[in-house]
């Protein structure tokens, strides 16, 4: 048996998230496993670095799987890309150690969120929208409060995250590039929907509906002083994974 790693890039708009689901629901894991199984004539089970939600994209998702196939890896990747939708591509196939695990071997992950102040018909698949003017200075102040180790349980919608809700944020910042507000966050791990909730909080800050100190109280004291809403999924990308 060999342990194979692929890098995967995808537009998540038309998928119901990464994780395989019953009942014929279209997911990225389900699509990739089905087509790999068709090529290799094996039951394939993929492990991924991040389980992205419905509508979330990936510039770099990392997956691995075990196979007994002797097929040349470049041919395997080419065959897989020929069967996948145009919105999903695999690249960089290579054999990795048997103990490599795309999720648990990862040291850091980076997400980016792309945000517009007003809707765009041409960019709506890949940007969220604040539907109003933003003050990037106070949003950056709020982002600075996130650096370090914090309990993010209130910013997750996954009950299983209660077991270990602490994440170490390594880098976190907002930048404006040609009218697009870009949020970049790098951490050792993330809870489910955590980045979308963080962006939602900072949109509230940027529009004057909250202040950075409200985020501080949420993280330090577990106090919610304003309604929490996750940002739209379409602006979010799994951007990088480090091993």
Curated annotation (Swiss-Prot):
GO molecular-function term, one example from the UniProt record: tRNA pseudouridine(38-40) synthase activity
Reactions this protein catalyses: uridine(38/39/40) in tRNA = pseudouridine(38/39/40) in tRNA
Organism ancestry: Bacteria, Pseudomonadati, Chlorobiota, Chlorobiia, Chlorobiales
Similarity comment: Belongs to the tRNA pseudouridine synthase TruA family.
Native species: Chlorobium limicola (strain DSM 245 / NBRC 103803 / 6330)
EC supergroup of this enzyme: isomerase
Protein name as it appears in the record: tRNA pseudouridine synthase A
Pfam families: PseudoU_synth_1
Transmembrane regions: none
Positions of the catalytic residues: 53
Gene: truA
Oligomeric form and interacting partners: Homodimer.
Entry binding sites for substrate: 111
